[in-house]
Regions:
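Conserved Rossmann-like nucleotide-cofactor binding loop
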Residues: 16, 39, 174
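Short beta-strand to alpha-helix junction loop
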Residues: 96-124, 176, 258-264
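Predominantly flavin-linked oxidoreductase catalytic cores and closely associated redox partners
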Residues: 125-275
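Beta1/beta-strand and adjacent pyrophosphate-binding region of the FAD-binding site
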Residues: 2-16
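FAD/FMN-dependent oxidoreductases across multiple families
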Residues: 161, 236, 255-341, 346-347
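C-terminal helical "tail/cap" subdomain of flavin- and related membrane-associated enzymes
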Residues: 340-453
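Glycine-rich FAD pyrophosphate-binding loop
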Residues: 11-13, 23-47
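N-terminal FAD cofactor-binding segment of flavoenzymes
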Residues: 37-90
Length: 453
């Protein structure tokens, strides 16, 4: 028995668990955090932030800003079409005005995050706090009172037992509690195979660094690429995220439709060539190879997010298509309000489920783009899809503003959301789309003055 004291327990010390620990410690709430230290050599997911994630990173973790890089654009490569969504708040005044009116702190950019350096620094910070009791281990069993919907006991791999006052399951795709408690799960996709890696600059070192590809137009963009069998030898959706001394590159492919491509090395070779064809030659700057990670996953949402004394935190409750940039944002939302579950779990669960379900429309839109036939995808459809994505993103941020910002900001957010839902306020042609030869697409999309469709 580690402790007779009944205190909160966090299972998992990835970003979700660490962020929750940080909040509990700030509230002087003693707790256990069970997991393992982050491995600074293993590539991670969740490096491209959406709006709310970027704001929360800046506000909750200001001391780690050396790991944040400006994200000024999202670029979609979809066959002959290339789409630019401009996110620089220093030049996009309408976007900046939205944040200001709804009560968010003023900030200039969305972010890419160096998760290797950030996670190591955050882990060091939380485990040094006297309110966090870190246990390097894993949970092997839980004793669950089904009638009371409460977790009574947690059993660790060394046989130790804890009697928690509350449990935050931050195990992400492992989904420890859902499997132990038999929580019904609705899968939102077929089985996916996600393959990703980091390519490093020869001078790479763990810690803050400047952007080694800074002179390239794509160095401050999340570049998303719809891969096709005809053009690239593989079907899926890929990403390229520059992060100072290294670049994060990967893809999510349908496991069944790409059965002929079995080697993770082969997948990365196809991916490297696909980006080079579009004018993004990241290997020119980042020549050093690292571990290639290959995992099978499905996107999902559980029937419920929590019970009387437990919560499926962030990615343990639901995961949607990665281009939404929502994974870390939901983790930080969970962390910001972590103490609310200790006071009123039923109310907190209801608000939480309502908020996270607002990401489902974005998942559906990304699914349309990813499953579409590139030959049939028109620029009008891309405008409709990207405008719908932005509309849903702004609606999510309005919902978030209602729970975290000033009363005036929350009121304006409620009004804006209502106008969008009534279709009295519409987002039209926010992104820019052009048709271009594949080898010229990257050059053309960043060239001012070209005629857009």
């Amino acid at each position: 028995m580690l402790s007779e004291e009944s205190i909160p327990v966090i299972i998992g010390t990835g970003l979700i668990g660490m962020a929750i620990s940080r909040t509990l410690s700030a509230k002087n709430i003693k707790h256990f955090a069970i997991g393992s230290p982050p491995n600074p050599n293993t590539p991670k997911l969740g490096e491209s932030m959406n709006g709310e994630g970027s704001m929360d990173l800046q506000q909750l973790f200001p001391e780690f800003r050396q790991y944040y890089f400006p994200k000024k654009n999202i670029i979609f490569y979809t066959g002959k079409l290339v789409t630019q969504c401009h996110l620089d708040l220093t030049t996009n005044k309408a976007f900046a005005a939205f944040f200001y009116l709804t009560g968010y702190n003023v900030f200039e950019n969305l972010f890419h995050v160096d998760r290797l350096g950030f996670d190591v620094a955050l882990f060091d910070s939380i485990t040094k706090n006297e309110n966090c009791i870190f246990i390097d281990g894993r949970v092997t069993d839980v004793i669950y009172d089904r009638d009371g919907d409460k977790i009574e006991e947690i059993v660790l791999s060394d046989g130790s037992k804890l009697h928690p006052s509350f449990v935050f399951d931050a195990t992400n795709h492992v989904r420890l509690l859902p499997k132990k408690l038999n929580i019904p799960c609705n899968f939102l996709s077929e089985k996916q195979r996600t393959v990703f890696t980091h390519y490093r600059h020869p001078d790479y070192k763990l810690g803050p660094s400047d952007n080694k590809a800074q002179k390239e137009s794509w160095s401050h963009s999340t570049s998303l690429l719809k891969l096709s069998q005809e053009l690239d030898g593989i079907e899926g959706m890929a990403w390229c995220i520059p992060l100072g001394d290294y670049v994060s590159v990967g893809t999510s492919i349908n496991a069944q439709k790409n059965e002929g491509v079995t080697s993770k090395e082969q997948i990365m070779e196809l991916l490297d060539r696909a980006y080079q064809k579009r004018g993004i030659d990241y290997r020119k700057y980042y020549s050093q190879e690292t571990e290639i990670v290959s995992i099978e996953n499905q996107y999902f949402i559980h029937e419920r997010a929590g019970g009387a004394n437990w919560l499926l935190a962030a990615g343990t409750y639901s995961q949607v298509w990665f281009p939404s940039g929502s994974g870390v944002a939901i983790a930080l939302y969970t962390a910001r309000f972590a103490d609310r579950w200790l006071k009123s779990p039923k109310k907190a669960n209801k608000q939480y489920e309502k908020f996270i379900r607002r990401f489902l429309p974005s998942h559906g839109i990304h699914d349309q783009i990813i499953s579409s036939n590139l030959k049939d995808l028109t620029y009008r459809q891309m405008y409709q899809l990207t405008d719908s994505l932005l509309t849903n993103s702004l609606s999510i941020m309005c919902t978030y503003a209602q729970s975290r910002n000033s009363s005036l900001g929350a009121l304006i957010a409620t009004l804006i959301k209502s106008l969008m839902e009534l279709k009295l306020l519409k987002i039209s042609y926010f992104c820019k789309i052009l048709e271009s030869e594949m080898e010229n697409q990257t050059k053309d999309i960043y060239t001012e003055g070209l005629k857009y469709l």
